Amino acid sequence: MQCIAFHQFASSSSLPIWSSIDNRFTPKTSITSISKPKPKLKSKSNLKSRSRSSTCYPIQCTVVDNPSSTITNNSDRRSANYGPPIWSFDFVQSLPIQYKGESYTSRLNKLEKDVKRMLIGVENSLAQLELIDTIQRLGISYRFENEIISILKEKFTNNNNNPNPINYDLYATALQFRLLRQYGFEVPQEIFNNFKNHKTGEFKANISNDIMGALGLYEASFHGKKGESILEEARIFTTKCLKKYKLMSSSNNNNMTLISLLVNHALEMPLQWRITRSEAKWFIEEIYERKQDMNPTLLEFAKLDFNMLQSTYQEELKVLSRWWKDSKLGEKLPFVRDRLVECFLWQVGVRFEPQFSYFRIMDTKLYVLLTIIDDMHDIYGTLEELQLFTNALQRWDLKELDKLPDYMKTAFYFTYNFTNELAFDVLQEHGFVHIEYFKKLMVELCKHHLQEAKWFYSGYKPTLQEYVENGWLSVGGQVILMHAYFAFTNPVTKEALECLKDGHPNIVRHASIILRLADDLGTLSDELKRGDVPKSIQCYMHDTGASEDEAREHIKYLISESWKEMNNEDGNINSFFSNEFVQVKQNLGRASQMIYQYGDGHASQNNLSKERVLGLIITPIPM
């Protein structure tokens, strides 16, 4: 057996469960930083292979050559009956990489310069805000971040220093508020008091006649923080206005207007909760190219950027597809969801920019690992086996493998090798050995999975509070964000590391709660069929006697409250964490809601999930 490049560490001590779940989940009645030069971003040139030190080899797993040898006492085990993947190896490898090459790059660069001149050259204040909004919704704002921040900073400064600022109407006020909040400028919610009836304290009734103003206020309200009552009132008020407008529009039997499409889209999910790529595709195809004042340069740039990024994703997916086939994990662990493409789809939501290819590839492998751990606990492992697996991980000792069944040996080897691969990369880029941090989180993850397994086998029905306190840690958000921290942070600080390892800061907690609850909303019906520990919806029903519909509404409310808490954290200037890491945290919440918006988008392979993969990864937008 070849030796791994890292020494084994001492056993982890028992892990405290950090939690401060408040009564929303009960029924309603710096130390010295480790500074290294900023690492170069991994580019597409090292997708196919990455050289490693000759002393670093993965541990080889030779215990499983025949898939059938992994299965023992099969009659005692549950089965989810997951179907085979609809995206085969041959299909992925046959994808044509259409939008690559110097001619496309040259054209994109030319268009980018034109759009930059356009953005800087706009003199009218409202027109400039509208252009920024359009650029964002077209999915190309990441190319103009410096220019956008400079423009918004100037507007923010002028507003603060000018005793007589521009007297905007509701539409313009809401648009500026949303854009400034989005980029971290502290704009007070009280600016919307100008649109309230001073006698009643309520928003003026005639706002319902200004549908673009109401829509703008609705979108702005989702940038509210915990305790901002004006924005909460705005959300409730404008939701009623937009639903009324939607009802009136649907009764006209005419073709949907662009405003109607925007209203329906917003009511389905606000912009703040949407991932950039899916919003860009929808806005390009459904709205922008149908607008009478559409700018051809902007449209061509947005389409070309989308398609060139998609070609990058296809290259990455081919690399991952070869890795998955060579690993034989699908054959050795036949009970596990074989959903490589869906695991990759998460990454398009988390970090879509072209320079983050290596992160998307490694994070996809991490999602594969989390899927294996999840299915092993939820579906296949016996309680005794799961305890043995957690013990083996905690000791991090290959000698423990003799106690495990063959299928768990495979899972352990994959966990062991992947963790050490990540640690090797972190050592190269940061000069820091992080394996103890990552290992501790993996052990913690399995302990919380094990708790759910104990509930299932004992028939125990947890309260909603018990479930969420355990579930936001069993869903794996803390593991995902630990990986992201090292990918997007330089220098690494001990304060942040200790916070991530032991304290589970709010920046991790709230994103993980959204992931947990969105998962529950999307997967409940499938999990009821196969039998599983009660999820948040069932826990609330059991706690309160509520119907399933009422319980779902309560879980949606908890998601909304978690977003407010996340918005609070985004404005925390004393945070240990970089803006890049904060963006990943936000995008994890957004990706969660995309994947589970119409059901179990991670496993079910229904038509809506298939269309999402086709639209974001497979099929280019016609030029």
From Swiss-Prot:
Localization per Swiss-Prot or TrEMBL: Plastid, Chloroplast
Disulfide-linked positions: none
Binding site for Mg(2+) 1: 374, 378
Record's keyword terms, sorted: Chloroplast, Lyase, Magnesium, Metal-binding, Plastid, Transit peptide
Ranges for region Disordered: 29-52
GO annotation terms (biological process): diterpenoid biosynthetic process
Pathway: Secondary metabolite biosynthesis; terpenoid biosynthesis; Terpene metabolism; (4S)-limonene biosynthesis; (4S)-limonene from geranyl diphosphate: step 1/1
Transit peptide endpoints, chain numbering: 1-60
Swiss-Prot/TrEMBL catalytic activity: (2E)-geranyl diphosphate = (4S)-limonene + diphosphate; (2E)-geranyl diphosphate = terpinolene + diphosphate; (2E)-geranyl diphosphate = (1R,5R)-alpha-pinene + diphosphate; (2E)-geranyl diphosphate = (1R,5R)-beta-pinene + diphosphate
Binding residues annotated for Mg(2+) 3, in chain numbering: 519, 523, 527
Biophysicochemical property: temperature dependence: Optimum temperature is 40 degrees Celsius.
Residues reported in the UniProt entry to bind Mg(2+) 2: 374, 378
Main localisation: plastid
EC identifiers of the protein: 4.2.3.16, 4.2.3.121, 4.2.3.122, 4.2.3.20
Pfam families: Terpene_synth, Terpene_synth_C
Tissues expressing the protein: Trichome.
Needed co-factor(s): Mg(2+); Mn(2+); K(+)
UniProt record similarity statement: Belongs to the terpene synthase family. Tpsb subfamily.
Domain notes per entry: The Asp-Asp-Xaa-Xaa-Asp/Glu (DDXXD/E) motif is important for the catalytic activity, presumably through binding to Mg(2+).
Protein name (record): (-)-limonene synthase TPS1, chloroplastic
Species classification: Eukaryota, Viridiplantae, Streptophyta, Embryophyta, Tracheophyta
